[in-house]
Amino acid sequence: KGWPTLNGSLTIDPKGPWEEDAPCVARLREHGAVIFGKTTMPEFGWKGVGECELTGITRNPWNLDKTPGGSSGGASAALAARMGPLAIGGDGGGSIRIPSSLTGVFGIKPNFGRVPMYPAGALANMTHVGPMTLTVEDAALLLTAISEPDYRDWTRLVYNNEDFTDGLDKGVAGLRIAYSPDLGYANVDPSVRKVVDAAAKVFESLGANVEEKAPGFENP
């Protein structure tokens, strides 16, 4: 409320009106969060890199010649630069996960309806609000807060007082995990493949059942 939300676009009037908080922001205020900034994004989230005509290029704090990814690249860059401990992102096709992986922070795309959204956009059934943080523990805490119900979103999941910090010590032993480093068709840089395979082996060492499995997508 009161802060322009321009979606990285020159087509939105910054004068507003900006009359109410989104559900996730309302929940954060109720829990005493201090909100001190908004971050950059490519226009309407349609890029996997951090650039737009409105704000220019957002750079990766670890290497200023590199991108922080997108579309929530401003959030990931701010976290990586230690400008704050928590951020909110939106993810349809990777817009939390891509920048989190490129800047070394933690981000998760919750399932549909987990975090209430309002107003709903045209892609609301695919694009979900989620936490971006410096640690898994902070992400669990943030997700617990922003997943609390909001009457404005009729697609929200049934709320059962979930506390996502309860699962932090459960481990992954016995879980079945499928992963695909190339989606069954993509060319993957050998260095990226090496890192992904090493991560899979870590889960195996922790007792998970890990299987490489292509999802059956056709090459777009």
Where are these regions (language model features)?
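A short helix-breaking turn/cap at a secondary-structure junction
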Residues: 106-199, 206, 217
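Short, internal active-site loops enriched in acidic
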Residues: 1, 216-219
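Generic structural signal for helix capping and beta-alpha/helix-loop junctions
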Residues: 43-45, 95-96, 187, 220
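Gly/Ser-rich catalytic/binding loops embedded in alpha/beta enzyme cores
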Residues: 1-93, 173, 199-201, 206
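Activation segment
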Residues: 87-88, 187, 212
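Structural signature of FAD isoalloxazine-binding scaffolds in flavoprotein oxidoreductases
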Residues: 97-102
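Short, hinge-like loop/turn segments at secondary-structure boundaries
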Residues: 53-56, 103-107
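General small-molecule cofactor/ligand-binding pocket signal
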Residues: 36, 209-214
